[in-house]
Amino acid sequence: MVLIRVLANLVILQLSYAQKSSELVIGGDECNINEHRFLVALYDSTTRNFLCGGVLIHPEWVITAKHCNKKSMVLYLGKHKQSVKFDDEQERFPKEKHFIRCNKPRTRWGEDIMLIRLNKPVNNSEHIAPLSLPSNPPIVGSVCRVMGWGSINKYIDVLPDEPRCANINLYNYTVCRGVFPRIPKKSKILCAGDLQGRLDSCHCDSGGPLICSEEFHGIVYRGPNPCAQPDKPALYTNIFDHLHWILSIMAGNATCYP
């Protein structure tokens, strides 16, 4: 009888440990405080609810996902813990918002991108600096890093106080076509994740970066529901495929794709 109780307690402890570990790795582990100086936190300025992540690419410009757009938004730069404010944290508001096809209500596959011009440039500091745009297309098979304040529980939204980081793999586009059969044969989408279902971006990570070879290659777009399922990677908007549009907008030479 005693042996049965001991074995039962060991099983309970193992199940408890497995559950806690699973919850922790959906959004990864806490990011190093110095590795995400470009990471932006987007909030609804009316409700003050957290919306999405974003990426600083220039002192005056931020990239995020189009589906993160709200009429009233505020952006925080230089933030780590949501509950603690750094001395160099800066608050900004959108001065301009640019979309791929601004006269089209529907977003095409791979075009879930929004370029925000800030109302005032930010200053580089200990916790704030832009991330480099890609110089070449990403390489399938690369290990990339995803980060954000998204949910750490795949079934209900449990947002962490600090951003989580995870290393995931970049897969061939055909892998994601098997998971999302509605996506076209060709699109401006990257396919990345962990086929064992241990690591994944999740709810509220939208708009955050996928970083490969220390360059900004993808925006968190969408994934399986619930997150972090085996053999089901997530979709990321491909930054390199939109590079000409991004640079043209920043230079004042373009507005929308036709």
Swiss-Prot record:
SMART domains: Tryp_SPc
Reactions it catalyzes: Selective cleavage of Arg-|-Xaa bond in fibrinogen, to form fibrin, and release fibrinopeptide A. The specificity of further degradation of fibrinogen varies with species origin of the enzyme
Keyword Protease listed: yes
Keyword Electron transport among UniProt keywords: no
Gene Ontology molecular-function annotations: serine-type endopeptidase activity; toxin activity
Domain Peptidase S1: start-end pairs: 25-251
Residues at the active site: 67 (charge relay system), 112 (charge relay system), 206 (charge relay system)
Signal peptide per UniProt: 1-18
BP GO annotations: proteolysis
UniProt cross-references to InterPro entries, sorted A to Z: Peptidase_S1_PA (IPR009003), Peptidase_S1_PA_chymotrypsin (IPR043504), Peptidase_S1A (IPR001314), Trypsin_dom (IPR001254)
UniProt-annotated location(s): Secreted
Prodomain positions: 19-24
PANTHER family for this protein: KALLIKREIN-1 (PTHR24271:SF47), KALLIKREIN-RELATED (PTHR24271)
UniProt family annotation: Belongs to the peptidase S1 family. Snake venom subfamily.
Function: Thrombin-like snake venom serine protease. Cleaves fibrinogen (FGA) to split of fibrinopeptides AM, AO, and AY; the aberrant fibrinogen is then incapable of being cross-linked, forming easily dispersible clots.
Subunit structure: Monomer.
The protein's name: Thrombin-like enzyme ancrod-2
